[in-house]
Amino acid sequence: MDKIQILRKISQTLFFIYFVFLTSFCLCFFGIIEKFILKGSVGQLIAKLVVIVVLTLILGRVFCGWMCPLGFLFELMYKLRMKLFMKKKLPTVNEEVHNKLIYLRYVVLILSLVLTYYLSIYAFCQVCPIGFLTNLYGTVISLIILIFFLSLSFFVPMAFCRYFCPLGAFLSIFSIKPFFQLKTNNNCVKCKLCEFKCPMQIKITEKLDQKECIRCFECKSSCKKDALSFSYAFKKRS
């Protein structure tokens, strides 16, 4: 394990402990948006939302890959599969199906906001697996959903994050073209080892989709040619 993965694991572990055991603060920033729709104000919580949005504009979806406790658990599940079956390549979803499913989370995002407005309830919070994990809005349904997606992540890496997470959809809007981007350079020999390790099933050697990337840097850590760099967006390709 290289230094960046060690740092990421430390970050994920600390944020997991903080959000799950040390705070009653609503972790899901999507919940803050729902609260704004219902009450017209979120008080000091708006500062937390602004920080995450600004961080995403600068670095991309770093929250998803470094801070989210749910993503941390899903990652543990697919890596457990890799260890048990001694696989080097992550399982993939049919490309045509995958390319359609990635838009499903935007449907979840819009539907959740519409239902929140018209039903005057925290629509997504009622079923959100994070709610159960952090003991905030946990329901039987959210427990079932948590167990389902933990199980699914054993077979489809980061399935919830890829296809269903409204917070991921929200942050994707701000990470279409972040200031710092992950890019391939002229060292790339198209071996696709980076793609074999990408939990989001991104076609890195063809076009690295910044809004889908959760900044886990598994691709960069796996590259033997140092063909991936995380640099300022307007820096010329080397």
From Swiss-Prot:
Domain of life, source organism: Archaea
Annotated PANTHER family: FERREDOXIN-TYPE PROTEIN NAPH
Parts of the chain that traverse the membrane: 13-33, 40-60, 107-127, 140-160
Binding-site list for [4Fe-4S] cluster 1: 188, 191, 194, 223
GO cellular component: plasma membrane
Protein name: Uncharacterized protein MJ0750
Native organism: Methanocaldococcus jannaschii (strain ATCC 43067 / DSM 2661 / JAL-1 / JCM 10045 / NBRC 100440) (Methanococcus jannaschii)
Gene Ontology molecular-function annotations: 4 iron, 4 sulfur cluster binding; metal ion binding; oxidoreductase activity
Membrane topology: Multi-pass membrane protein
InterPro entries: 4Fe4S_Fe-S-bd (IPR017896), 4Fe4S_Fe_S_CS (IPR017900), Electron_Trans/Redox (IPR051684)
Subcellular location: Cell membrane
Residues that, per the record, bind [4Fe-4S] cluster 2: 198, 213, 216, 219
Keywords: 4Fe-4S, Cell membrane, Electron transport, Iron, Iron-sulfur, Membrane, Metal-binding, Repeat, Transmembrane, Transmembrane helix, Transport
Domain 4Fe-4S ferredoxin-type: 178-208, 204-233
UniProt cross-references to SUPFAM superfamilies, sorted A to Z: 4Fe-4S ferredoxins
Ribosomal protein in keyword set: no
